[in-house]
Every structure is written in structure tokens, then in C-alpha cells.
């Protein structure tokens, strides 16, 4: 294993999902374009969408990467590590501090999320309707988290 894979310096997305990001920039779909939000925020949004699914294994990585590590904001980094902790099933706590594994997991879920975004794009849903749908889903998840059994 080379040093780059052991100590990654960027977050990557697949080549297919790079095309989806380009389409978001072109269409300004849901204001997810680079003029409206940072790449860190877009990555986090995609990762959040993908987090409730089976992650997509990364086959073809966009060679330029998506976000250099120095550009990852603290909120995104905290969420990446929180995702790793929440998905951790082993007994070795060193796994949740292994940056290579943490980034790999985040990238897999983000790439899954970009595929979900692609489905939204191809369904040609109205951005406002989609936003309300996502808010209803978030409300439902919040209720599930905060419902105390009687």
C-alpha cells in the first residue's frame, strides 16, 4: 500500500459523479452549483443522502480529486468522522481514526449520494417540491431519533 492511500490528501468522487457535479453547476439545480455552495458542502450533502443506503464502491476515481484536504471545512470533517463512528461495527477503535478508512467510507457514501442526486436530476422534479420532500424526510428521521418509547 503506498503512502497516498494510507494518508490521503483529498476527497475523491467517481468520474461518473464528476459529470453529475458538472451538470449541477450548469443547471444550478437546487442551488447545488459551485457559485452557491462550497464543494465541501456539496460533498456533505451527497454523503448525507447516501448514508442511509448501501455505499457505492469506488471503481473509477476522478484523477484530480474533488476536494483537497486543506479546503475541507471543520463541519464537513466532523461529519465525515461522525459517519465513520456511526458505521463502525468492530471492536478496534483505531479504525475510526484511520484517515484512509474514514475518507474511503465518506467517499463511498458521497458517491452513492451523487447517484441519488442524478436520479433527482433525471426525474426533472421541481427543486421546490424536492426540497419539501427532503425536509419531510428529515422531519421523519428527527421524530424517529427523538421518540421515547412509553
Tell where the protein language model's regions lie, with residue ranges.
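Charged, low-complexity intrinsically disordered terminal regions and linker tails
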Residues: 1-31, 44, 56-150
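Short amphipathic alpha-helical segments
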Residues: 37-47
Amino acid at each position: 500500500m503506498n503512502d497516498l492511500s494510507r494518508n490521503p490528501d483529498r476527497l475523491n468522487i467517481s468520474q461518473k459523479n464528476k459529470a453529475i457535479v458538472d451538470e449541477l453547476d450548469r443547471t444550478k439545480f437546487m442551488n447545488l452549483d459551485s457559485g452557491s455552495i462550497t464543494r465541501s458542502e456539496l460533498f456533505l450533502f451527497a454523503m448525507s443522502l447516501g448514508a442511509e443506503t448501501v455505499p457505492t464502491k469506488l471503481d473509477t476515481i476522478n484523477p484530480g480529486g474533488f476536494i483537497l484536504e486543506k479546503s475541507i471545512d471543520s463541519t464537513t470533517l466532523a461529519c465525515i468522522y461522525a459517519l465513520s463512528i456511526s458505521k463502525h461495527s468492530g471492536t478496534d477503535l483505531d479504525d475510526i481514526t484511520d484517515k484512509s478508512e474514514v475518507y474511503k467510507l465518506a467517499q463511498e457514501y458521497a458517491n452513492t449520494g451523487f447517484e441519488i442526486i442524478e436520479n433527482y436530476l433525471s426525474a426533472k422534479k421541481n427543486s421546490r417540491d424536492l426540497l419539501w420532500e427532503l425536509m419531510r424526510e428529515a422531519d421523519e428521521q428527527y421524530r424517529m431519533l427523538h421518540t421515547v418509547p412509553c
